[in-house]
Each structure stands twice: as C-alpha cells, then as structure tokens.
UniProtKB/Swiss-Prot annotation:
Superkingdom, taxonomy of origin: Eukaryota
Residues modified as Phosphothreonine: T236
Name of the featured protein: Peroxisomal biogenesis factor 19
UniProt record similarity statement: Belongs to the peroxin-19 family.
Phylogenetic classification of the source organism: Eukaryota, Metazoa, Chordata, Craniata, Vertebrata
UniProt GO MF annotations: ATPase binding; peroxisome membrane class-1 targeting sequence binding; protein carrier chaperone
Lipidation (S-farnesyl cysteine): C296
General function of this protein: Necessary for early peroxisomal biogenesis. Acts both as a cytosolic chaperone and as an import receptor for peroxisomal membrane proteins (PMPs). Binds and stabilizes newly synthesized PMPs in the cytoplasm by interacting with their hydrophobic membrane-spanning domains, and targets them to the peroxisome membrane by binding to the integral membrane protein PEX3. Excludes CDKN2A from the nucleus and prevents its interaction with MDM2, which results in active degradation of TP53.
Residue numbers carrying Phosphoserine: S35, S54, S66
Entry coiled-coil feature ranges: none
GO cellular component: cytoplasm; cytosol; membrane; nucleoplasm; nucleus; peroxisomal membrane; protein-containing complex
C-alpha cells in the first residue's frame, strides 16, 4: 500500500514538473514573440507618376492640337500640310524658350477655329491675325533699324523676358519666319493669280450691270492684283536679302492699296482658300491697332 502511494506521489510530482516546464516554455515564447508589425501607411504619390502640367505646357499642347485645324481652314489641303509642318517646327523651338509666347499664339489659333459665316466671328479672327502680324512686323523692323550692338540687343531682350540664358537669340528669326511664311508667294500667289486671270472676263460680262464707280474700283483691283503677281513672279533663288526685303515691303504696300479698294466680287473671291475669304484686314500691317486686337498682341 505504501509502495502504491509513493508511486502515485511520484507521478503527481512528475506531472507538476512537466506542467511547470511547459508554462516556462510558454513564458519564454511570449517574451521572444516579435511585436505586431505597424499598420501599413499610405505611400506618398510616386514622383514619377503623372504631374500637373505647367500653364506653358498646357498652352503648347493645346496649340499643337489646334494648329492643324487652323491651317486647314486658312489654306488649301496641300499647302496646309506644308504650313503645319513649318509652324510646328518653329513653335516647338519657341515653346522651349518662351512658353508665354506660345499662349499668345494659341489665342490666334482659337480665334481661327471659331471663324464662321457671321460677321462677328470673322472680325474677331481678322483683328487677331492683323494685330499679331502687326506686332511681329513692328518689333522685327525696330530691332533691325535700331543699330544696337549684340550686347545691347541681348540686354534689351533680357528686359523683355526673352532671354533664355543660352545666348542663341533664336526668337527674332522665328518671328520673322512665321510672318514671312504667312505673306509668302506660296500663300498669296496661287489664289491671286487665279482671280487675276478670271477678272477680265468677269468685268466684261458685268460691265452693264455694275455702277460705273464700282466698276472702276474693280478695274483698279485687277490692276493691283496683277502687280502683286508680278512681284512674286520676279522672285529667283539667287535674290539677295535686300531684294527679299524690298519685295516684301512692295507687296505689303500693294495689299494696302487693294484693301482700300474694297472686296473683290463674291464670284471671284470664292476662289480663295476656305477661311481666308480675301479679307485684306488680316494683312493690314500699317494701320494702328484696333480695340479688339489688344488681346492678341504678342509683343
């Protein structure tokens, strides 16, 4: 009996020791258990993700998106493709140097996109284009005639916010190129030549139905158009810069005379590329800025 009790006590003691061992092991496990990981925090936006575009970039994108429509409306399809390529190249260079100037050109494109049959929309576009070209012409002429040294010119451009710091001075040639392309032989000559060739027959068939005073103006229009065509036909690849400049000024003077004579007959003006409509106000570079053009002035 005593032996049995001793055996029982030994078993209980062994169970107690096992229980203590297990509890000790559990305590050690709890101490070694790593603390819970902190909840994941919201990561900051990826710096390489989409960024908000600057006003200059926005204007540039909008301008490139609309310029093709602008030239399609202003010129015929073949010339529009060439003008689009030249304009896009020039504007990309300009956008890198002067984003705020791109925004001004965008206003011109937007005005062209709103041109419709009503007089108000046409006036908005013609006024905008006239004042844009007036600003380009005035500043180009002033700089050429100022006699400023290279250093003085650089300082002046810095004062106008036109210095990009690399000293390339590409703004003026770009402005001149755009202006001369708009008033070039490729743009004006084809339509003017076609109207000039059709004018004599039209005058003959309408002489009896038109008031004498108006008929005389149409005759003068025909004569001036012929002189403009002669200026363009006199161009040669070997012409000097002075010759180009003199011819450009002569064409501007003739276009002013043409404007003073009023619009040509609708039957003939219809031969002009869509969007141009022979509105000579768009080419009047010598007149004072109009009230509506102030929003479109570049310089």
């Amino acid at each position: 009996m005593a032996a049995a009790e001793e055996g029982c006590d030994a078993g209980v003691e062994a169970d107690r020791e096992l229980e203590e061992l297990l509890e000790s092991a559990l305590d050690d496990f709890d101490k070694a258990k790593p603390s819970p990981a902190p909840p994941p925090t919201t990561s900051a936006p990826d710096a390489s993700g989409p960024q908000k575009k600057s006003p200059g970039d926005t204007a540039k994108d909008a301008l490139f998106a609309s310029q093709e429509k602008f030239f399609q409306e202003l010129f015929d399809s073949e010339l529009a493709s060439q003008a689009t390529a030249e304009f896009e190249k020039a504007m990309k260079e300009l956008a890198e140097e002067e984003p705020h100037l791109v925004e001004q050109f965008q206003k011109l494109s937007e005005a062209a996109g709103r041109v419709g049959s009503d007089a108000n929309s046409q006036q908005e576009f013609t006024s905008c284009l006239k004042e844009t070209l007036s600003g380009l012409a005035k500043n180009a002429t002033d700089l050429q005639n100022s006699g400023m040294s290279e250093e003085e010119l650089t300082k002046a451009m810095e004062g106008l916010g036109m210095d990009d710091g690399d000293g390339d001075g590409n703004i003026l040639p770009i402005m001149q190129s755009i202006m001369q392309n708009l008033l070039s032989k490729d743009v004006l000559y084809p339509s003017l030549k076609e109207i000039t060739e059709k004018y004599p027959e039209w005058l003959q068939s309408h002489q009896e139905s038109i008031p004498p005073e108006q008929f005389e103006k149409y005759q003068e229009q025909h004569s001036v158009m012929g002189k403009i065509c002669e200026q363009f036909e006199a161009e040669t690849p070997t012409d000097s810069e002075a010759t180009h400049r003199a011819r450009f000024e002569a064409v501007l003077d003739l276009m002013q005379q043409l404007q003073d004579l009023g619009h040509p007959p609708k039957e003939l003006a219809g031969e002009m590329p869509p969007g141009l409509n022979f509105d000579l106000d768009t080419l009047n570079l010598s007149g004072p800025p109009g009230a509506n053009g102030e929003q479109c002035l570049i310089m």
